[in-house]
Amino acid sequence: MPRPILVRAAIVALLVAAALSPPTAAGSIRAGRLGIGDSVMLGAKDELHARDFGVVDAVVSRQFYDAPARVQHWKRLGRLPKNVVIHLGNNGIVRASDCSHAVQAAGIHRHVFLVTLKVPRSWRILDNRRLRFCARRFANAHLIDWYANSRDHPGWFARDGYHLTASGQTAYASLVARRIAAVP
């Protein structure tokens, strides 16, 4: 028969583990949508959650080269949903190989949505070309053309030209949700 102290220790360990688990992790399975991004996506986090994103895995200054590892992380946890949205590249270049590896890491039974950039930086044009190419290259990859949909709406952006205002957050999340809904 287990000692009462060991039983209490086991219960405490379970409670601590439950408290430390990310509260939205289980939601990723239920909602079927995961966002991987940088500060732009992070700014729209609440709007994305309102549109059934279980997890918005976005941090300030994240680079596109982090995308394959983030996809693999959620896959290893068994929490990679059917729809994965990747919006990275605002902080540096998108390499074609990183884009390919991110899509391949998701697997052929998941949809990967690549979001184009609206950032006033020298690499934007080339990054958007690479994102378009990557979306065309894989049957399960799809493009969300944020650049084309947002370039004529300066009110959607803060002074820096790419972080989102409240109306920009709403427009961004709406576009992403509509594009996901359009894919069978």
What are these regions (language model features)?
Residues 1-34, 41, 46, 77-80, ...:
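N-terminal secretory targeting modules
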Residues 27-101, 119-126:
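Conserved SGNH/GDSL esterase-like catalytic core that processes O-acyl groups on lipids
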Residues 34-36, 113, 142-144:
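Hydrophobic/aromatic beta-strand patches that form the interior of the parallel beta-sheet core
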Residues 57-59, 115, 144-149:
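Conserved beta-strand termini and adjacent loop/short-helix elements that scaffold enzyme active sites
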Residues 108-111:
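A short helix->loop->beta-strand "cap" motif at the edges of active sites that frequently abuts
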Residues 124-184:
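Catalytic His-Asp segment of secreted/periplasmic serine-dependent ester chemistry enzymes
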